[in-house]
Amino acid sequence: MPSPVEQRVSSKIRRTVRNGEAIYEKEYVLNDWDNDAAVIYHRAQQEIELLRQLAVSNRFGGRLGVVSVAAADPEAATIATHEIAGMSLGQFVLEDENVATNLTPWFLAGRWLRQFQSLRLPNDMTETVSKRDPTDIVDYCGLRLDSLLEFGYSWPHSRLKTALLKKIECLRDHCDDTSKVWVHADYAPGNLMWDGRTLTPIDFAMVRSGQPLEDATYLIHRIEMHLVYRPWLRLPVAAIRRAILRGLGLPTADQSAAYQMLMLKHQICRLHTYVRRPASSFKQALHDRWVRTVLRRRLLQAVKNTLK
């Protein structure tokens, strides 16, 4: 008889009310990362244990919030958490009239990461979510670039691809900090809840081990992309970047090899997303083409000196 995970056809997150409280229920499903049910059950158990560890840790509290588990069933790969008050930072960027001047949530996002990274990693924690993904960043980026051709996207040409991977390899070899820490792996504005005082990350389904700058650079990358999607926004990207890195305790990290390397990775992955995801309308197709053009320019800019 198929297991609960094998019977599901897609992931689900649904909002329900229990005893007068709003609850979000999440179901893990095959194809989220692997077609191996054992991997899915393990990752569900891992997320449950992490959320419980966060709940009892003295590193959080006050303005650094944590998700509260309402119910969990690792055998069914399901987790229910209490609703977090406020709005996501994705909504904050688009809707709050103080977004141009209020840097507090961004500083707290960096500070939350600093506390998160101080937690001990379990011995069986891996650096990848899927067994199909390489752990080496050069191989990982090479796989994403090769995949572009599989979707019929004839970029980059072989010389440019080689230059990009050489650049990433050089930056990797010059990274000073090779330590491994907890990585949320989807530390995007939409997964950071803000109620005006407390910053609370949600959705730890992709958590893994990784480099200290991975989450911070991903958050900064997503903010930078907002100005590509919506150039009319009054968004102080440079100030937000500084606030995040100050909160993390690494105010000059944007000058490091690790920062530059991870930003190239994020840009390659963002390009891959905008190539493989079909547009739902003509207007969306034009928008996606613009985003791809910007990302290509930025990647080309990173290696232009080596192509002369």
Where do the language-model regions lie?
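Active-site activation/catalytic loop segments of kinase-like enzymes and analogous catalytic loops
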Residues: 214-251, 265-284
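ATP-binding pocket architecture of kinase catalytic cores
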Residues: 21-125
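C-terminal subregions of glycosyltransferases and related glycan-biosynthesis enzymes
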Residues: 11, 133-152, 243-244, 248-277
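Phosphate/pyrophosphate-binding loops and the adjoining catalytic core of nucleotide-dependent enzymes
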Residues: 1-16, 22-26, 32, 81, ...
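Active-site acidic catalytic loop and adjacent metal/ATP-binding pocket
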Residues: 3-24, 169-214
